[in-house]
């Protein structure tokens, strides 16, 4: 099991997650998924941080995981921001880009960083849950550096159009939660719904 953040440094938590995902890449070729899948993709791993509870930190954890795996661990990643209309991660990327464009200091820092990691920033695509899979397929067909992992930042409700369909195509779904009774109950309901309706 993954270590909790309070049990050790946050980097250790992401290192454990990285080791788990890396090991699962090899297993994926030998084991068929238990999720009902319509995907015809090859090696990319689709990952979503999702619950039916809003404001639990899905966008934050998605951005942290994508940035750590891309910038520190060297994986090629991409993010499909399906959390319309706020598009928190896409908005953050636009603000970062504007800041770099307007400041020679930050431009120099960015150039130095990308030179060190020998790659550009990972792509962030603004989408919605209904069109997320099509946008991911289009992005994968166009990208020169094919992502190893594609993260999907999902809306905070299962009632949004396309959420269940998109989640049904994930290789891994992580459900962030806090130590709160209502959050835990909501997350358990989400897991039961997923098990009963989308697992074969």
Task: State the predicted function of each range.
Residues 78, 155-200:
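Conserved catalytic-core segment of NTP-binding enzymes
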Residues 5, 9-50:
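Extreme N-terminal, non-catalytic leader segments
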Residues 39-75:
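Walker A (P-loop) phosphate-binding motif
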Residues 62, 89-91, 149, 160-161, ...:
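Short, function-defining helix-loop hinge/capping sites that tune catalysis or transport
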Residues 50-56, 71-150:
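P-loop/Walker-type NTP enzyme "switch/lid" segment
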Residues 63, 67-71, 94, 168, ...:
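Short, well-ordered alpha-helices that flank and scaffold nucleotide-derived cofactor binding pockets
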């Amino acid at each position: 099991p993954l270590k909790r953040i309070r049990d050790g440094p946050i980097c250790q938590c992401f290192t454990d997650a990285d080791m788990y995902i890396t090991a699962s890449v090899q297993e994926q070729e030998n084991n068929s998924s238990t999720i009902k899948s319509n995907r015809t993709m090859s090696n990319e791993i689709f990952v979503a941080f999702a619950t039916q509870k809003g404001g639990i930190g899905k966008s934050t954890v998605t951005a942290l995981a994508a940035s750590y795996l891309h910038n520190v661990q060297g994986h090629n990643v991409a993010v499909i921001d399906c959390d319309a209309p706020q598009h928190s991660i896409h908005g953050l990327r636009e603000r970062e880009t504007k800041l770099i464009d307007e400041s020679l200091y930050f431009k120099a820092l960015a150039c130095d960083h990308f030179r060190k990691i020998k790659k550009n920033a990972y792509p962030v695509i603004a989408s919605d849950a209904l069109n997320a899979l099509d946008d991911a397929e289009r992005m994968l067909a166009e990208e020169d550096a094919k992502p190893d992992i594609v993260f999907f930042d999902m809306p905070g409700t299962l009632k949004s159009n396309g959420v269940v369909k998109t989640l049904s195509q994930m290789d891994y779904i992580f459900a962030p939660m806090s130590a709160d009774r209502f959050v835990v109950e909501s997350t358990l309901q989400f897991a039961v719904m997923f098990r009963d309706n989308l697992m074969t």
